[in-house]
Amino acid sequence: MSDFIVGLTGGIASGKSALAAEFEKLGIPVIDADVVARQVVEPGPILDAIAHRFGRAILLPDGMLDRQALRQIVFADPVQRKALEAITHPAIRAELRRAALAARGPYAIVAIPLLAEAGGRATYPWLDRILVVDIPAALQHARLMRRDGATPELANRMIAAQATRDQREAIADDIVSNDRTPEQLEQEARRLDVVYRVAASEH
């Protein structure tokens, strides 16, 4: 049981996954919001609610979610997107918390890419600490073009669609700057691991 929970977030291409992997090497369970988001729309009550709201055309013949069909509906219409989020987001948050509390370790990390956009602690009041991975804008831009093959214009749009660095840092208890070597990122994870283990033991 891990009742001390750290929220991990950062902008696109900031290195959230790399930092999460360093904590996993230290034996810390990491629950990924992207994975949970895919799990909650597997056949079951949440998918039933989505089909009821958007119609059975968003289901594949085998009863699974047709992600492309749903994506075309919600990305074209902000009202539809909010309707989908009203169904899925509470279920995702509840499952993240359940999985974190059930995890075996001195504490658990929940990786939430859009934590700042979702409202930070106001939306996730059960987070004991928030860790933000920060990256200079120029390096983030270069990584996006290299990693995703994005054009400079697309990279700019992808970054602009997310919270600003200031907005993320405003919700942070801890900030790791990921403009260094993998070895330095590992050292930062080890340093914070000590901090979190102590905090969890006193929790």
Curated annotation (Swiss-Prot):
Q: Which UniProt keywords apply?
A: ATP-binding, Coenzyme A biosynthesis, Cytoplasm, Kinase, Nucleotide-binding, Transferase
* Chain positions recorded as ATP binding sites: A13, S14, G15, K16, S17, A18
Q: Matching PROSITE patterns, A to Z? A: DPCK
- Which cysteines pair up through disulfides? They are none
- Entry's localization field: Cytoplasm
Q: In which pathway does it act?
A: Cofactor biosynthesis; coenzyme A biosynthesis; CoA from (R)-pantothenate: step 5/5
> Under which EC number(s) is this enzyme classified?
2.7.1.24
Question: What broad class describes the main subcellular location of this protein?
Answer: cytoplasm
Q: Which InterPro entries match?
A: Depp_CoAkinase, P-loop_NTPase
Please provide, alphabetically and separated by semicolons, the GO molecular function terms listed in this UniProt record.
Answer: ATP binding; dephospho-CoA kinase activity
Cited Pfam families = CoaE (PF01121)
Can you state which reaction this protein catalyses? 3'-dephospho-CoA + ATP = ADP + CoA + H(+)
Q: Does the keyword Mitochondrion apply?
A: no
Which SUPFAM superfamilies does UniProt cross-reference here?
P-loop containing nucleoside triphosphate hydrolases
Gene Ontology biological-process entries: coenzyme A biosynthetic process
**Record GO cellular component, one term:** cytoplasm
Q: Is Phosphoprotein found in the keyword set?
A: no
Q: Which HAMAP family match?
A: Dephospho_CoA_kinase
Q: Which family does it belong to?
A: Belongs to the CoaE family.
Matches recorded under NCBIfam families: dephospho-CoA kinase
Function of the protein: Catalyzes the phosphorylation of the 3'-hydroxyl group of dephosphocoenzyme A to form coenzyme A.
This chain belongs to the protein called Dephospho-CoA kinase
What species does this protein belong to? Xanthomonas euvesicatoria pv. vesicatoria (strain 85-10)
Gene (name only): coaE
